[in-house]
Amino acid sequence: MAPSKWDDEEDSSPPPPPPVVARRKFDDEEEEDVLDSWDAAEDSEVEREKAAKAAAAAAKAEAEAAAKKKSKAQRIEERKQERKKLAEANESDEDSEEDEAARRARLRRTEKEGDLKHAQDLFEDIDLNRNRGTPKAIVISDSADPTQAVDLSAMPLFKPTTKDQFTRLTSTLIPLLTAHSKKPHYALWAQEFTKQLVKELNSGDVKKIASALTTISNEKMREERAADKGNKKTKAAKTKVSLVASRDNKIDATPYDDDGLDDDDFM
């Protein structure tokens, strides 16, 4: 009898896979392995946090170093951009009912403050509190009549701008000042006056003025030496003439034969 179809199918089906035998848990194997895996996971998380913090610190240090390497112009430009963003943010926060005139005034004020800050950054070594362009009022009053006062700073003579005007100022002041050159305190006053005159100049101009004063000093020394030599020659000549004139040129004509003694007195 021929085998049935079902028998063929049963014979041709693959054998079932072997059963998986679960690993037996030993007595000494408890939950430590599970805890170790958890600890390892926690350690990995801590390490990742540390690495992230280190990377953030390194990035911050690099940013600070890059900021320090930036030029002054770059830093100023960044500050201008920050102020611009801040002004725009403030503008967006303002009440929508703000009129156009008030908005323009606020923007002008913000721009002016930014320009002032920009100037301070460029000229940080300069004292902006001193207003060099506007001289102080120099008022001279009469002690006998205080109502009679003159503001010298308002006179055109004391506001020179051209070379000729400075020359005129010099020709006016020099005679007034040098008239006191023979007074005891004039030399000390001249030193302090010169220091005050050159105080606002740069080092190059001060050096030129010092060189000019050195030249004048050398010329004065030569003149004084020549004058000393002339005085010595004059004194020597006067001394010689006085010695010659003081000699007694009279002839001694006194008779010494008639001395009131006779020859017999020695006998």
Swiss-Prot record:
Residues 74-88, 108-118, 221-231 have a biased composition (Basic and acidic residues). It comes from the Eukaryota. Pfam families: eIF3_subunit (PF08597). Keywords: Coiled coil, Cytoplasm, Initiation factor, Protein biosynthesis. Residues 1-118, 221-241 are annotated as: Disordered. Component of the eukaryotic translation initiation factor 3 (eIF-3) complex, which is involved in protein synthesis of a specialized repertoire of mRNAs and, together with other initiation factors, stimulates binding of mRNA and methionyl-tRNAi to the 40S ribosome. The eIF-3 complex specifically targets and initiates translation of a subset of mRNAs involved in cell proliferation. Component of the eukaryotic translation initiation factor 3 (eIF-3) complex. This is Eukaryotic translation initiation factor 3 subunit J. The gene is hcr1.
